[in-house]
Amino acid sequence: MPVQPPSKDTEEMEAEGDSAAEMNGEEEESEEERSGSQTESEEESSEMDEEDCERRRSECVSEMMDLEKQFSELKEKLFRERLSQLRVRLEEVGAERAPEYTEPLGGLQRSLKIRIQVAGIYKGFCLDVIRNKYECELQGAKQHLESEKLLLYDTLQGELQERIQRLEEDRQSLDISSEWWDDKLHARGSSRTWDSLPPNKRKKAPLVSGPYIVYMLQEIDILEDWTAIKKARAAVSPQKRKSDGP
């Protein structure tokens, strides 16, 4: 068989393949060039970034130092202002002109007035209670005195009546004994009786003062002794009558 010549389409396809290979080669070369330029630019930019960072760091440090200095100055200024304000307030308080002092002081003065009024009212009530208690005690003391006076009067009256009664009994016993002696004298036949004697010849009873110890006794003791003696004499007289009889 005779050899056929290549067709036109086949040639075109080969030509396109060659052109594509050439284009790919060119593209690879351009990419290599771009990558090289990028690495160079990155190195340059890294060097610039380090310098810029160092410069910015130094600027930040200087700014920070300036800020710290300003802050310390402001703090010192604020401290001086606060100190001066406190001194002024202290002077106002010492002069009793500060509102922090005058307002509580006014409240304390008002409460003081109220407490003084309450204390005055309480004092009045206490004085009334004491006055009433004093009047009650005084009235009770007067009533007690009157009752004691009446009791003492009744006691003394009873004692005096008892003494009077004893004296009456003693007088009656003396009268009885004197009559007995008169009867005895008449029974013996005495010619001279007590009544027949003239008054100038009658023997008077001697006035003899008792021993000193008698006057040292109380009156009630003397009366009791005297009554006991008279009763003893009255008891002895009937025994003498019996002995004198037949």
From Swiss-Prot:
Cellular component aspect of the GO annotation:
cytoplasm; nucleus; Sin3-type complex
Which InterPro entries does the UniProt entry name for this protein?
Sds3 (IPR013907)
Q: Which taxonomic lineage does the organism of this UniProt entry have?
A: Eukaryota, Metazoa, Chordata, Craniata, Vertebrata
Which intervals of the chain form a coiled coil? none
| Organism (species) | Bos taurus
Q: What is this protein called?
A: Breast cancer metastasis-suppressor 1 homolog
Tell me what gene encodes this: BRMS1
Q: What is the annotated localization of this protein?
A: Nucleus; Cytoplasm
- Cross-link position per record: Glycyl lysine isopeptide (Lys-Gly) (interchain with G-Cter in SUMO2): K184, K242
Say what the protein does. Answer: Transcriptional repressor. Down-regulates transcription activation by NF-kappa-B by promoting the deacetylation of RELA at 'Lys-310'. Promotes HDAC1 binding to promoter regions. Down-regulates expression of anti-apoptotic genes that are controlled by NF-kappa-B. Promotes apoptosis in cells that have inadequate adherence to a substrate, a process called anoikis, and may thereby inhibit metastasis.
Report the SMART domains cross-referenced here: Sds3 (SM01401)
